[in-house]
Amino acid sequence: MTKKVWISRSQPGAAALADKLAASKISVLQKPVLTISPINCPYPRELPKLVICLSGHAARIYRESSASLSNKTIKHIAIGRETASILRSSFTNTIFPFDERSEGVIGLREIQEISVGEIVWLLTGRQGRGVIESVLENRGCKLYRLALYEQVRKEVKGIDPEKISCVVVGSVVGMQYVEEFLKGFKGTLSVPIIVPSLRIKKEAENLGFTEVYNVGSANVSDVSIFVEDFLVGR
């Protein structure tokens, strides 16, 4: 029986990952447990000294907003390569950390040099990360946390856990929905879980999953390579 990789992360990342794995002759089941719903979030009138973007979803929504037009020359920080590539189509002064996670952003010189009272926009989702937000608040800047979207649960059907080789998860919220689905289906949490960060790995283990692997990146290419290597070693 050929088992499939269940890609539970949201679009468009799910489709991009599915294409890469399919190109390597890996069977996939593209069943996102979340959809992304934009939020009508008002942008500040005050122009920022720095814009920090924590996801590709936030980058796409922000890039299409009229508020972004005044920020063309302002420095932008992206959480990783994929988010940076979205921003750079409109904002050439965009950087990202070598360590593509919250800790990497925090370690950047641009974050360390933020002064008291400087205006910073933090672009994220409603269920976004709090680590960077806490660091910025402690630095005394004038922080605007802009929740541009929310992750909405999507019902999934037609999945037999016994026919799944592993599950690729993209967020804590997605991890929780995968856990609820699997518990409702024979109660098994033994299926291997592949996650992008240590934070989500810990969440998966706290939920009871017994085999969790951390890619250390949410980048589609990195995840694809990791999944391929994982399956070769099974």
Model-identified regions with their sequence ranges:
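Signature of uroporphyrinogen-III synthase
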Residues: M1-R234
